């Protein structure tokens, strides 16, 4: 049987930890993996050959990841694969440790990295399955947009729901503050993240389901911007 490597990138969150917990549980139950490794500090751990053997972690320990904050597993990074040298190094390390499965948890860059590694492994004849575990607050890692408005692969990315919940609470609190001090601050402007897709902005409406709040949602297109 082949070995498996799990790595994460981007912001460390309980959402990522829970996704990794699910991956560990499924891999152990599959009976198709010999050893299970966690890459210390994301893809950097692969490049530096720092693979932590987590095969013998008990089910009780793994279950704790469901509510573990920050990078409660083996760390994260924001390093982007920059060269063919990096890609070749990753494939070399995987071949050395008989890795047949690679799971990379993160956003757009992580999915791109997993795809590049997968393609290079095929070129070199390495029997390697690469999979991305999506985590992004922007909700933009889901494949092509379908006619019904949903995404082809993953309609609600892990990380998006908790972000919207937090934003809704912030808006409700801001509205209460505005009611108390509108004579000096008649209008409050709240800027949110979301890249080009605008799902976080749209989700702000959940703070006011009955449409009683004077809430105006403005997407980047309204200002002729394309990189917000």
Predicted segments — roles?
Residues 9-11, 39-44, 78-79, 107-108, ...:
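Short, ordered loop/turn segments at secondary-structure junctions
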Residues 13-23, 46-47, 83-87, 108-116, ...:
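Short glycine/serine/threonine-rich phosphate/pyrophosphate-binding segments
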Residues 1-7, 92-95, 179:
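Short, hydrophobic/aliphatic alpha-helical segments
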Residues 39, 93, 101-106, 112-131, ...:
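Accessory alpha-helical/coil subdomains and C-terminal extensions
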Residues 36, 68-76, 212-218:
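Short beta-strand elements in bilobed, periplasmic/extracellular small-molecule ligand-binding domains
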Residues 3-13, 72-77, 100-106, 187-192:
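Short glycine-rich or small-residue beta-strand-to-loop segments that form or flank ligand, phosphate
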Residues 48-100, 109-111, 147-151, 156-173:
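Glycine-rich oxoanion-binding loops at beta->alpha junctions
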Residues 1-50:
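N-terminal phosphate-binding or glycine-rich loops at protein starts, especially the Walker A/P-loop
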């Amino acid at each position: 049987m082949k070995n498996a490597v799990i790595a994460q990138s981007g912001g460390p969150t309980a959402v990522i930890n829970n996704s990794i917990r699910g991956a560990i549980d499924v891999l152990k139950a599959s009976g198709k993996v010999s050893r299970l490794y966690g890459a210390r500090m994301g893809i950097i751990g692969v490049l530096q050959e720092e693979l932590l053997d987590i095969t013998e972690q008990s089910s009780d320990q793994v279950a704790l990841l469901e509510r573990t904050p920050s990078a409660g597993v083996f760390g994260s990074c924001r390093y982007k694969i920059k060269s063919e040298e990096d890609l070749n190094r990753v494939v070399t390390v995987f071949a050395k440790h008989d890795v047949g499965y690679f799971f990379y948890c993160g956003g757009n860059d992580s999915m791109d990295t997993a795809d590049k590694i997968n393609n290079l492994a095929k070129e070199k004849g390495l029997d390697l399955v690469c999979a991305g575990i999506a985590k992004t607050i922007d909700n933009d890692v889901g494949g092509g947009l379908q006619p019904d408005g949903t995404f082809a692969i993953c309609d609600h990315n892990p990380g998006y729901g908790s972000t919207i919940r937090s934003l809704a609470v912030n808006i409700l609190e801001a509205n209460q503050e505005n009611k108390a001090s509108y004579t000096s601050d008649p209008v409050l402007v709240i800027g949110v993240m979301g890249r080009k897709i605008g799902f976080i902005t749209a989700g702000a409406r959940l703070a006011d389901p009955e449409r009683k709040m004077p809430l105006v949602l403005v997407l980047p297109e309204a200002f002729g911007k394309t990189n917000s």
